[in-house]
Amino acid sequence: GDVYKRQAQIIIWQEHISLIKSQRLNEMKEKRITIGDKTLKFDFLIYGEKPKSGRSLYISMHGGGGAPPQVNDGQWKNQMRLYKPNEGIYLCPRAPTDTWNLWHQSHIDPLFDRLIENMIIFEEVDPDKVYLMGYSAGGDGVYQLAPRMCDRFAAAAMMAGHPNETSPQGLRNLPFALQVGENDKSYRRNKIALSCVARSLQNFRKMTLKAIHTS
């Protein structure tokens, strides 16, 4: 019955934890994850007491992009100083590349998947309390990754970024904040943010009406 099913789930999960801990201990000690030819470095700080359900995880993506490595390294270090949550793990990854689109290339998805799984297993993160944020080039990444990886996050916050070619359709069930200054005219970010909100609302209404008519 359900009791045996639950017991089997617990056994399988515990075996999975043991396997991951044996395979990935070094990458957590070194704070770097490599998949293929891309390496994601990261650092994190822990705040507050751990709740019974596990810690919150805040993944905060730095700005920069399209610049020499030392510039993006500086942006990464600066990102570590920006927020201090009352509870949870504040984690800042260092983008694997220094390109303008450093946070929304295809290699980011599997790297973030592995990072989140590692933090759940090694640092007792609650998988239902994983949050994504970023500003400038990091904001670009939030625009892109939140719809693509919406099942991984409890909420996402975009600051001063540009959506580029992304679609908001994956955000229907994901709380999503846009923070762009009224006078932030670089790359037309202020006007594009308004357009993105309007498009999202329009898509939401269409999907809601479709669900009503087909139910």
Q: Which residue ranges define each predicted feature?
A:
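Short, small-residue-biased leader/transition segments that mark boundaries at the very start
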Residues: V3-Y4
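Short beta-strand/loop motif that positions the catalytic acidic residue
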Residues: A177-V180
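Active-site machinery of serine-nucleophile hydrolases
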Residues: R55-I121
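A short loop-to-beta-strand scaffold at the N-terminal edge of the catalytic core in hydrolase folds
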Residues: G36-E49, L57
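Gly/Ser-rich "nucleophile elbow"/oxyanion-hole loop immediately N-terminal to the catalytic nucleophile
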Residues: E49-S53, W100-A137, R148-R152
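Primarily recognizes the serine-hydrolase "nucleophile elbow" in alpha/beta-hydrolase
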Residues: D128-R172
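Alpha/beta-hydrolase fold active-site loops
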Residues: R55-S56, G88, K129, A154, ...
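C-terminal catalytic histidine-bearing segment of alpha/beta-hydrolase fold enzymes
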Residues: K185, K191-S215
